[in-house]
């Protein structure tokens, strides 16, 4: 039976070896972690009661890590049991030890959550390169610059920037965030309500009745179709239908200022005033103008307000340049083109709903999850594309002999393949033959399997960002100092290193491993003092 070497405690300032000779802490570190015959010796590592045994030369492959550096791991040594004790996660240490044994291969155990395993990587100080490689293998976004948010150098600009950009920074900032959310919701409600038939009918009916223009039944049908397209996007009465009639006069004078006195237009104007004011204030106070326009949320703010000004400018131009229509088709085509362009521009207003993500942590987590899962989503779309081509072709040839087939061509069958693989099944197109039904069954099964494959990866990314966000909120309540190496100031515990004798003996040796404040914390403290 192998006898284990042990150390006995002596007077403060000295350590006795296995033969009883006196050693100081420095001599003990050299004997324990030095080269020569000692490098083939084995040491015992206790992880929360689970003992591991490995060779010193295995750990010395990575001397810049916690276990590979004798000076760093000595603070965890228990001389009574002749082992290193770590009160850490036990399942994670299997992968940590395998990292040393395999020469740098880091694989997370399936029963260990991602955030816990990353904490273990940081604790054992495997290095930034190992952490970055692990995050890339897990499909997570690379760290760097996300947690350290720059602030303006001027005190006034800093206060304004915190007021409009960080709602959690103060009470007034939360009030401004609440006002912004209410304005966004009002704008979205107005965007939906103005398309109701009763509101669209008021503007259309008023212009037709007031214009005094009589149209033939044939021309009335065509112009009513144009009016429906017009009212589907424009403000009530913004482009009157009387102006499009043959032989009629412009109805702008008849309507007077209906466009500028419409309740929807007035509420929309108030919302745009707030959006513009908020955007200009944030732009003037931002620390970097170039980074301001690279932010996707600021681009959404611009997209949310420019349709209003384009529509307003078009309306003003038409009010000043509208001429009586003499029945020419060129004027009608120009009007139709203007209506189509404005309809698309007005559709952009729906993107205002994404402004809510600035004030919602949940939407931000969802956006980061989708960004981190772009590779899996791309594979999903690629597999769906292959399935659509395959099954649409198969169902077309399976139904080719049926005279009542609903699949006249392969492109027409694309729609059926998409709704079948996504398990929607509208029922507007369906196979009738036995072969077509078999193809449809296989298409549905393939769609379920294809969609289910990337779901675990997406869920894992969502859990990672969710736990990281909650941890940041909890850590933000405390003063946190990070350091590259552990602090030697230990209190008395049950292990040997916690004993006053051994701590006193190795204090001078470990004085070089004192922690230094993290750069981000130092900058934050300077800003607080200012």
Curated annotation (Swiss-Prot):
Question: Which InterPro entries does the record match to this protein?
Answer: BTB/POZ_dom, Ion_trans_dom, K_chnl_volt-dep_Kv, K_chnl_volt-dep_Kv1, KCNA6, KCNA6_BTB_POZ, SKP1/BTB/POZ_sf, T1-type_BTB
Q: Could you state a single Gene Ontology molecular function term?
A: voltage-gated potassium channel activity
Membrane topology listed for this record = Multi-pass membrane protein
Q: Which residues carry this modification: Phosphothreonine?
A: 528
Give the UniProt record's GO annotations in the biological process aspect: action potential; potassium ion transmembrane transport; protein homooligomerization
Ranges within the bilayer without spanning? 411-422, 423-430
GO CC terms on record?
axon; axon terminus; membrane; plasma membrane; potassium channel complex; voltage-gated potassium channel complex
Positions carrying Phosphoserine:
3, 222, 512
User: The motif PDZ-binding: which residues?
Assistant: 527-529
Q: Where is this motif: Selectivity filter?
A: 423-428
Domains as described in the record: The N-terminus may be important in determining the rate of inactivation of the channel while the tail may play a role in modulation of channel activity and/or targeting of the channel to specific subcellular compartments.
The family note in this entry says: Belongs to the potassium channel family. A (Shaker) (TC 1.A.1.2) subfamily. Kv1.6/KCNA6 sub-subfamily.
Q: Subunit composition? A: Homotetramer and heterotetramer of potassium channel proteins. Interacts with KCNAB1 and KCNAB2.
Q: What protein is this chain from?
A: Potassium voltage-gated channel subfamily A member 6
Taxonomic source organism: Rattus norvegicus (Rat)
């Amino acid at each position: 039976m192998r006898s284990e070497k042990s150390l006995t405690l002596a007077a403060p300032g000295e350590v006795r070896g296995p033969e009883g000779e006196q050693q100081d802490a420095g001599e003990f570190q050299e004997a324990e972690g030095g080269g020569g015959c000692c490098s083939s010796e084995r040491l015992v590592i206790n992880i929360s009661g689970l003992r591991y045994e490995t060779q010193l030369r295995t750990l010395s492959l990575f001397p810049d890590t916690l276990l590979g550096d004798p000076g760093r791991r000595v603070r965890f040594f228990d001389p009574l049991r002749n082992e290193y004790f770590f009160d850490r996660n036990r399942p994670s240490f299997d992968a940590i030890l395998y990292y040393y044994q395999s020469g740098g291969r880091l694989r997370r155990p399936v029963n260990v959550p991602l955030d816990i395993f990353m904490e273990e990587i940081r604790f054992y100080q495997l290095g930034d390169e190992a952490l970055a490689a692990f995050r890339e293998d897990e499909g997570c976004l690379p760290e760097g610059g996300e947690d350290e948010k720059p602030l303006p150098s001027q005190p006034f600009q800093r206060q304004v920037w915190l007021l409009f950009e960080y709602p959690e920074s103060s009470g007034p900032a939360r009030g401004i965030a609440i006002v912004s959310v209410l304005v966004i919701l009002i704008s979205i409600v107005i965007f939906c309500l103005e398309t109701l038939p009763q509101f669209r009918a008021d503007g259309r009916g008023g212009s037709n009745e007031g214009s005094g223009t009589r149209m033939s039944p044939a021309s009335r049908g065509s112009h009513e179709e144009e009016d429906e397209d017009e009212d589907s996007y424009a403000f009530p009465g913004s482009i009157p239908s009387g102006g499009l009639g043959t032989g009629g006069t412009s109805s702008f004078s008849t309507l007077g200022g209906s466009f500028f006195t419409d309740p929807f237009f007035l509420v929309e104007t108030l919302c745009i005033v707030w959006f513009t004011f908020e955007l200009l204030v944030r732009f003037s106070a931002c620390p970097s103008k170039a980074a301001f326009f690279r932010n996707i949320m600021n681009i959404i703010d611009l997209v949310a307000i420019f349709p209003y000004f384009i529509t307003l400018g078009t309306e003003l131009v038409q009010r000043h340049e509208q001429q009586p229509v003499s029945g020419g088709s060129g004027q009608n085509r120009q009007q139709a083109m203007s209506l189509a362009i404005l309809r698309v521009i007005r559709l952009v207003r729906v993107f205002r709903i994404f402004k809510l993500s600035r004030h919602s942590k949940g939407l931000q987590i969802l956006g980061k999850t989708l960004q981190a899962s772009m590779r899996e989503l791309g594979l999903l779309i690629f597999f769906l594309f292959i399935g659509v081509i395959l099954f649409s072709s198969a169902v077309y040839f399976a139904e080719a002999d049926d005279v009542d087939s609903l699949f006249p061509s392969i492109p027409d069958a694309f729609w059926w393949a998409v709704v079948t693989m996504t398990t929607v099944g509208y029922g507007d197109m369906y196979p009738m033959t036995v072969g077509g039904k078999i193809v449809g069954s296989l298409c549905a099964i393939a769609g379920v399997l294809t969609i289910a494959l990337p779901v675990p990866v997406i869920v894992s990314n969502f859990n990672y960002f969710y736990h990281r966000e909650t941890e940041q909120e909890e850590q933000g309540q405390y003063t946190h100092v990070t350091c590259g190496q552990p602090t030697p100031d230990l209190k008395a515990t049950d292990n040997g290193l916690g004993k006053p004798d051994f701590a006193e003996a190795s204090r001078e040796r470990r004085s070089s491993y004192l922690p230094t404040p993290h750069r981000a914390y130092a900058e934050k403290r300077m800003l607080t003092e200012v």
